[in-house]
Amino acid sequence: MVAPSLPDIVVYDTPGQDIPIWSHHTLRVLYALHRKGLPYAIVPLEYPDIEATFEPTSLLPKDDPVERYEIPVVLFRSRGGPNSDPDEYLMEPARIIAKLDTLVPNPPLPFASPRATEARTIFGPALAPILQIAVGYVPSVLSARSREGFLAKRQARWGKPLDVWVAERPQNKLLETAAPRLQAFADWLEGNGLQGPFIEGAQSGYADMTIVSILEYARLVGATDAFDAAMAHPRIARLYATLVEKDQMAARPPQVATIC
């Protein structure tokens, strides 16, 4: 029996003006692709063009009247070989990474293991204030056209302009909220009893990529105080550094492609 050929992988993403990748959702997917050793190309897509690009495709929209489609979208494009699957569009990092696990089972990227599930209950609240801080910086990294679309979507979702939403959540208060939560997560990591820097020990998984992608997002958009607050904890900094630096996740520039 002839094994199915792996598809070409195309990642649609909204770039920044000066930084090609900034979204924590996209970073999470790229980390997974690097971990699997899978090549990919990136197609840049301005924020207002997202819906018009994917509405004619087989990608099923979300049940969300504000954002029916969200970046990143990954196209698994068939190479047309024996037993190849048809083209498939996917969005939402968890679904995309589950697909990658079916294409290349090793190394696995556990999502719902007992340790990853427990970790999520601790790092989720710890990183929520960092996400709230970072979103206020996003418009400054976008092109004028994408910035306009991003701000319109945020206002539609929150019922108020982004700058008003941010002003209601002062950064110093969010950092105060984050401080004990980050400490609790660092203590949990330190006391995990496993060898290695990651949640499962020596092997990085989906949860580790989620954590690092959020920290990188904060750093890339300019939320330096939020990033530094997390990195002040040596155990969190170790997880981050091992994933980004030792595994060289950020040192492999993707091919930028256009799709006809």
PLM ranges: what are they?
Residues 121-236:
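GST-like fold's C-terminal all-alpha helical module
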Residues 28, 32-35, 99, 177-188, ...:
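Amphipathic alpha-helical segments that form well-ordered structural scaffolds
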Residues 2-152:
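GST-like domain detector, emphasizing the conserved glutathione-binding G-site
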Residues 235-244:
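Intrinsically disordered, low-complexity polar regions and short flexible loop motifs
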Residues 1-10, 245-260:
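Eukaryotic N-terminal targeting leaders
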Residues 43-48, 199-204, 253-258:
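Acidic carboxylate-rich catalytic motifs and surrounding loops in phosphoryl-/glycosyl-chemistry enzymes
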